[in-house]
């Protein structure tokens, strides 16, 4: 009698006893070549399709990220269907397993210490890492300029108005108010990450290990000192998705309206924080309402229609105030990097395939009440964000839901779990963070040098003497940073709509940048050393 591993794949599923290992043994002879063909297509074929002109690296190298993402989704879906999702599922019922309570205060303490250390090293210069862009934008807002209209800003308005509110509330300068807001964002985001993993119902004992792996990978972004790289921006939407598990279960109309209202509020909060996560949340909640609830089809269609109306209103307001402009430009490839076969990208591909297998088997087994499915739906739109500007940091942060869900699933398999966890630790945590430290070491050294040699930093008197050498006003299209860190703010200097050449990526923004320099001949230009490099 033949072993099930020797049976044709379709026969194995008819027996109902095929395990993922059985399917792997029977399919690896064709699946490995299939994966290699898929990789070749994803990494090469997009070079044959032209993309819209921009200053993005992808355009310079002739790589079309949109085609690459479409090919990834196609080969993932086809591979899942051909393997029947490797029968990746569990018959164990969902259950609540709490994280150890001591992990939260320890996590908060480490975040506080990390933020305090970075502030002690570089906070006084009000412009280290990612923070100079944000502090400069907050300063323009404080001058009465309107964000998104008078000056460009690529994140949600909460990252501008939060620090400014602290500036008006407390006796702190704009720079210090920003760093306080950054620290509070990291702390609050850590709480959301902890609660998200703690509250999700899943039959695994590995939740503490998964929390540690996600937490430490995100902790090292403190070296960037940017509110755009904190747990609040990326863990908050996951927590709200987990909260969706209690929604759309009651068919009574007042309860449906309440659930719609709650989702609209959640979506609006995410627009204020990070608009692309609001889009992903809207997609996730719609899929949950349509596919994961046992209500009558008429009621599910009603919920979906009301969600479209509610989200449409939220996004219409955001569009009116130009909050979505940067997201739409980025979606067109304005800041893309080519998708290359680096270790973080490959591990991310594997995590996407694992999640797709689980989603497929969930529908096959009709186990659509799985609390993790909301994370999977959320992760689908976030693929575009992760594989647009696809450096390791963007892959990790935008792929946070994918990594979280895939770690949960792999923790159920004794042999696969340590292999997958090791791959994650090496190529999503250690390798990217080591390179991150390498990139920021020169800035850290510069900050330490100015600490030891304060006379090397231009004094206020010298800067004012420089500015008074010209009787008129100035234009500083590339910023004015006498100490090499934060921009020196002066009402006599016009900095333009864009910060330096950040996000000056599409023909329209390039033309606007050139007009700022050429249409005011009465103003003197402040240029950095070697301006021809720009």
Region spans (language model):
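Transmembrane-helix motifs of polytopic, lipid-linked glycan transferases
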Residues: 180-203, 236
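Hydrophobic/aromatic-rich transmembrane helices and adjacent perimembrane loops
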Residues: 64-71, 236-239, 279-280, 388-421
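Start-transfer (signal-anchor) and selected internal transmembrane alpha helices
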Residues: 1-2, 6-39, 62-118
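Short hydrophobic alpha-helices at membrane interfaces in multi-pass membrane enzymes
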Residues: 208-212, 237-268, 297-306, 369-378, ...
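Signature aromatic-anchored transmembrane alpha helix within multi-pass, membrane-resident enzymes
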Residues: 23, 28, 257-261, 286, ...
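Transmembrane catalytic cores of multi-pass membrane glycosyltransferases
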Residues: 42-47, 114-160, 172-184, 219-229, ...
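Short periplasmic/luminal acceptor-recognition loop of GT-C membrane glycosyltransferases, typified by
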Residues: 153-154, 455-534
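Membrane-interface micro-motifs in multi-pass membrane enzymes
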Residues: 51, 55-74, 156, 181-182, ...
């Amino acid at each position: 009698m033949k072993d099930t591993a020797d049976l044709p794949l379709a026969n194995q599923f008819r027996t109902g006893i095929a395990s993922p290992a059985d399917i792997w043994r029977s399919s690896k002879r064709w699946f490995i070549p299939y994966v290699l063909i898929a990789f070749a297509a994803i990494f090469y074929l997009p070079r044959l399709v032209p993309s819209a002109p921009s200053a993005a690296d992808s355009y310079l190298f002739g790589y079309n990220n949109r085609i690459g993402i479409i090919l990834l989704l196609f080969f993932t879906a086809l591979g899942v269907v051909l393997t029947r999702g490797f029968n990746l599922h569990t018959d164990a019922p969902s259950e609540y397993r709490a994280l150890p309570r001591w992990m939260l205060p320890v996590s908060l303490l480490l975040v506080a210490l990390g933020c305090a250390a970075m502030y002690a090293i570089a906070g006084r210069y009000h412009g280290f890492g990612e923070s100079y862009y944000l502090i400069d934008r907050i300063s323009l807002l404080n001058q009465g300029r309107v964000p998104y209209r008078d000056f460009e800003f690529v994140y949600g308005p909460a990252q501008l108005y939060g620090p400014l509110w602290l500036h008006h509330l407390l006796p702190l300068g704009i720079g210090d108010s920003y760093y306080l807001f950054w620290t509070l964002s990291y702390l609050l985001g850590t709480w959301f990450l902890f609660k998200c993993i703690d509250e999700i119902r899943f039959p695994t004992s590995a939740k503490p290990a998964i929390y540690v792996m996600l937490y430490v990978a995100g902790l090292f972004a403190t070296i960037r000192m940017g509110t755009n790289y904190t747990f609040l921006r990326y863990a908050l939407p996951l927590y709200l998705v987990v909260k969706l598990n209690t929604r759309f279960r009651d068919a009574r109309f007042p309860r449906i309206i309440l659930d719609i209202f709650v989702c609209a509020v959640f979506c609006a909060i995410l627009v204020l924080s990070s608009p692309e996560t609001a889009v992903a949340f809207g997609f996730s909640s719609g899929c949950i309402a349509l596919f994961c609830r046992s209500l009558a089809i008429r009621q599910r269609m009603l919920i979906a229609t009301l969600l479209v109306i509610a989200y449409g209103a939220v996004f219409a307001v955001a569009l009116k105030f130009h909050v979505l402009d940067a997201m739409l430009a980025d979606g067109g490839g304005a800041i893309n990097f080519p998708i290359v076969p680096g270790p973080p990208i490959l591990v991310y591909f594997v995590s996407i395939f694992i999640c797709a297998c689980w989603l497929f088997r969930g529908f096959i087994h009709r186990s659509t009440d799985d609390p993790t499915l909301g994370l999977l739906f959320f992760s689908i739109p976030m693929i575009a964000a992760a594989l647009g500007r696809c450096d390791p940091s963007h892959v990790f942060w935008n792929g946070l839901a994918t990594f979280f869900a895939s770690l949960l699933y792999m923790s159920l398999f004794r042999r696969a779990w340590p292999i997958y966890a090791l791959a994650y630790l090496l190529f999503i945590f250690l390798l990217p963070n080591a390179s991150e430290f390498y990139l920021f070491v020169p800035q850290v050294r510069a900050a330490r040098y100015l600490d030891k040699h304060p006379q090397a930093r231009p004094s206020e008197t010298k800067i004012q003497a420089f500015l008074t050498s010209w009787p008129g006003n100035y234009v500083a299209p590339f910023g004015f940073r006498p100490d090499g860190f934060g921009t020196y703010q002066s009402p006599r200097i016009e900095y333009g709509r864009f910060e330096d050449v950040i996000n000056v990526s599409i023909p329209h923004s390039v033309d606007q940048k050139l007009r700022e320099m050429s249409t005011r001949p009465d103003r003197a230009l402040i240029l950095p050393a070697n301006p021809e490099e720009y």
